[in-house]
Amino acid sequence: MLTYPNINPIAFSLGPLKVHWYGLMYLIGFIGAWLLGYWRIKHYKLNWNNDQLSDLIFYSALGVILGGRVGYMLFYDIQEFIHHPWVLFKIWEGGMSFHGGLLGVVIAAWLFCRKYGKTFLEVGDFVAPLVPLGLAAGRLGNFINGELWGRVTDVPWGMIYPHVDDQPRHPSQLYEFGLEGVALFILIWCYASKPRQQGRVCALFLMGYAICRLIAESFRQPDSQLGFVAFGWLTMGQVLSIPMLLIGIWLWWAKR
């Protein structure tokens, strides 16, 4: 069995300012997305320029942070938000919802499309290959924070989280890093390397992420304040992923 390494969540301090690994992971994700987008524009000679790319990443970053935090409080911890609304601003403590962030990015993309006259699916297809890198970084942030641990297990790589209990658990953050980050990145990046019907790359991302999340969540301990939310075995993350899967299937079929 393995033991969680108990990593200090603070990467470094600048005087009174403490810089957390969790925040750095998001910064790495946004910078990585810009670099990948820049490479795709140059390599595939896409009809994008650097100003558009920078604006898209900026809009998306706001959508991810605002939507992710608000989504977490609404989907996962509504009672805490009602009684202590100021916790909404404690982003460094963790507590971000991918699905809330996705809704934030959808709104950001809509505003971006209005400004630059691009279609929503064009933007979706462009940004989809850039997202998994950020997801991978975010899951590493979860692991460093020692949050979102897995269910009790007897597999040889089970990990004991001393701050939780003395039982070995699935390192589910690392499963999600591998599925939603690495595997999804390879899938989307390779698929988007050739010209596709508009909307297809976006559809594949929606389906791919939903499937990866449905699988990974089956190893993850449900949030203590929620437990299983449907049929006695579905977590909130799985429930929120089902509409993604259905929309992805519909979009894939519509753009065949």
Curated annotation (Swiss-Prot):
EC primary class: transferase
Cellular compartment(s): Cell inner membrane
UniProt entry keywords in alphabetical sequence: Cell inner membrane, Cell membrane, Membrane, Transferase, Transmembrane, Transmembrane helix
Stored InterPro entries: Lgt
UniProt-recorded Gene Ontology molecular function terms: phosphatidylglycerol-prolipoprotein diacylglyceryl transferase activity
Transmembrane region(s): 19-39, 56-76, 91-111, 231-251
Family membership: Belongs to the Lgt family.
The protein, known as: Phosphatidylglycerol--prolipoprotein diacylglyceryl transferase
Organism, scientific name: Legionella pneumophila (strain Paris)
Gene: lgt
